[in-house]
Amino acid sequence: MRLTSAMCRRGVGLSLGAFLACISTLAATPVDPSGAVSLPAVSIPYSIFASDEARRQFVESMMDPSAPPPGSSIEATRSFYDAFNSNLVSRMRKRYAAVIKTERIGGVNTDVVTPVQGISPENQKRVLINLHGGAFMWGAHSGGLVESIPIAVIGKIKVITIDYREAPEYHFPAASEDVAAVYGALLKTYKPSQIGIYGCSAGGILTAESVAAFGAKGLPRPGAIGTFCGSAVDVKGDSAFIAPILDGQLFAEKPLSAFDLLYFKDVDPNDPMVFPGASTTVLARFPPTLLITGTRDFAMSSVVRSHELLTQAHVESELHVYDGMWHAFLIFPELPESNAPYSVIAHFFKQHLGQ
């Protein structure tokens, strides 16, 4: 039987062998010797596994024209994201009743978030540190509250979010030095096993950096950590190319690297204090690690690779990948796909932090 393209498209009355031949025929795409694939123009539907709420938020986020364009002043960028995050904080507080107070710890400004209903008995001697996202340039205060409020309330635990130093005023390793200062101060009250650290995007990268820095400074490792939409290796791999397309952006021949960020000016890309995945020895000192990402997150491959490297280093590592979810999707409180990881995060620290 001679296969035609029409028969393949219909797929009716074909044997298994013919059906597989059709797949091969229809899916054939030029692949060069390096493994690079040239793709034709395609229309990719949104994930059938994602919620209606996620679909609406995805469209709204990707079509929002109000974000400042690349090259905008740092003042304009910070102003935009502070307003953006402040709106999210208001939405968070309608769902999650929290008490917020500012406190200077270890010489660093922080916001301390606790649940209105009180900290659970098992968490009285536990604390979480949040490291906010924002490309190491924005996210102080409001961005940290977005990431801290739901975890504090769902987990019934105290969360301290740190306003670490950012670019362009400061560069690596200023942020991890601030985290170490707060962590060191908390060690006067808590055992290291009672302290957890987590962050999203830049905060996920900073969480991994901070654990590496603790080891270099002779500080004990914390009880557990979470790195979300950013982790122990640079933003590379398939998702760095594919996710922008899935998010409706133009294809980039050279995707953005963390080393393009102002914060990492003039750093050594092989320095394990920047990306601990560069050293198995450094990774082997990591505590149990929770990793979260989405299939439309440009950092997905780096998070998956971090999980793989942690596993190879015999570190307990737990990976969750949410279908159809984009970078830092956890900041939207209305999504079922955000509420699911909130519970995962709370449970992970409940299971791994000491009493």
Task: Give each language-model segment a name.
Residues 1, 28, 88-95:
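Short, solvent-exposed secondary-structure boundary motifs
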Residues 7-10, 26, 117:
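Intrinsically disordered, low-complexity repeat segments enriched in small/polar residues
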Residues 4-6, 29-42:
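N-terminal intrinsically disordered, low-complexity tails enriched in polar/charged
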Residues 22-30:
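Bacterial Sec-dependent signal peptides at the C-terminal "C-region" and cleavage site
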Residues 2-15:
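Bacterial N-terminal signal peptides that target proteins for export
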Residues 13-23:
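Bacterial N-terminal signal peptides
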Residues 31-35, 44-73, 94-355:
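Alpha/beta-hydrolase superfamily serine-hydrolase fold, recognizing
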Residues 74-86:
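Phosphate-/polyanion-interacting regions in eukaryotic proteins
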